[in-house]
Structure formats: structure tokens, C-alpha cells
Amino acid sequence: MIIKIILCTFALRMIETLTYMQWAVIVLSALCVGMSKTGVQGIMLMIVPILAMAFGAKESTGIILPMLCMADIMAVAYYKRIADWKIVVKLLPTAILGFFLAIGVDSLVPHGQFRQLMGWTLMLALVVMIWSEIFGKENRWMKKWWYAAIFGLMGGFTTMIGNAAGPVMSVYLLSMRKEKMEYIGINAWFFLVVNLLKIPLQAFVWNNITWNSLQLNLLMLPVIGVGAVIGVSIVKQLPEKVFRRFIQVVTILSVILMII
């Protein structure tokens, strides 16, 4: 009963401060976040720019991050037995380094320049990956220690700057030729750890997360849950080959958006 009263109070406060357009955007975003974390990853392509337009570029990162954490927990709860922790551990050290690199250069270098550089790097990696698949040749780079280190660094940097590490992880895991469920499981664990580590940095260094934004996130929890269930249902219906092609196409589109 007390929880219901608190939630109703939160809702009334939010209704007074948000426009109809902002409510529509936040509900759509919460639904898509849930779907993306349980498998339909390409759907996040449209959410980040729409949120930025509705709430502002900086403010939107603080709004979406707690929702991503909620959805990550749901994804991990469902896919917890599938992930390859060896891969997650390889990526995490340089991902954390990427956080602090992002903080260090935040006020020195335009984000767009870094996004373009990483976009071209990912495009090169995509070309190599697709070439190796077409001609049946093994990508020898992926066995090198620096291969995971580079992707971890890019993932940490891009996720800190604009919650945009999805294409980075997609290129890495596609090049590792992981099967559908393992791909989603690794993604879920990696981003759960990474996003939880980002919370104090976003809250206390960049001041992007506020008590008001957390109230809004709490209200969106049921919507995120619905999205997560829809995502699981869709992924179950997709054959392995179709899922891989879908992720490849979405990743290429994401990389192009990073470059332009």
C-alpha cells in the first residue's frame, strides 16, 4: 500500500513536469530498451537520438542509463546460464579504462570526432569479418590479446559518452561467431557490469542522474518488463542464420550513423 502511494505521488509529479511528447518518448524508449536487452538490439537505433531531442543530449544519457540497468538485470535473469564469462572478463579492464578516457577528453575534444574515428574502425572490422565469412577464412586477429582490448576500450568510451556501445559489442561478438543465445547472454552480462559501474560516474561526475530522473525510471519499470518479454518471444522465433543477418544489417546501419 505504501509503495502504491509513493508511486502515485511520483506519477503526479512527473505528469506536472513532462509534456505529452516527452511522455510518449519515454514510454516508447522504455519498451524498446526492454526489447533490445533481451535480443532485438537494433531497435535502440532510433531511441538514443529521439530521447536526445526530447530531453536534451546530456540529460537523456542520465534518463536512459538506469532503464538500461533495469533491462540488463532482466536479461541476465533470463540468460544467466548461457554467457561465456571468459569473453566478458577479457573486455572489462579496457572498458573501464575507456570510462576514464571519456571523462578526461569530455571537455577537450568534440564527441563527434571520436565517434567518427570509432565508426571507421568498426567499419574496417566489419569488412574483415564479412570477408572472412564469405571466403571461409578464419579471422586470426580475434585470438590476439589486443583484439579484445581494443574493443573493450572502444566499448567503454562510447557507452560513457552516449550509451552507444551496442555496435562495438556487435562487431566483436559477430567476429567471434557466437551463437544466438550465447551472443545475447554475453551482451547481457557485459552491459550489466558496465552500466552499473557507470552509474556513480554519471551521477557524481557529470551530474546526469537526478532524483527526479530516477523517479521517472521507476515509473517505467513495468513498461521495460513488457518490452523484455516481447524481446524474448521474438528471439525465440528467429532462426540462427536470420538472427545473425539481422544483427549484421543493424550493426552496419549503426556504424554508418556513427560516421555521418
Where are the language model's segments positioned?
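Hydrophobic/small/kink-forming positions within alpha-helical transmembrane segments
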Residues: 69, 73, 92-100, 130, ...
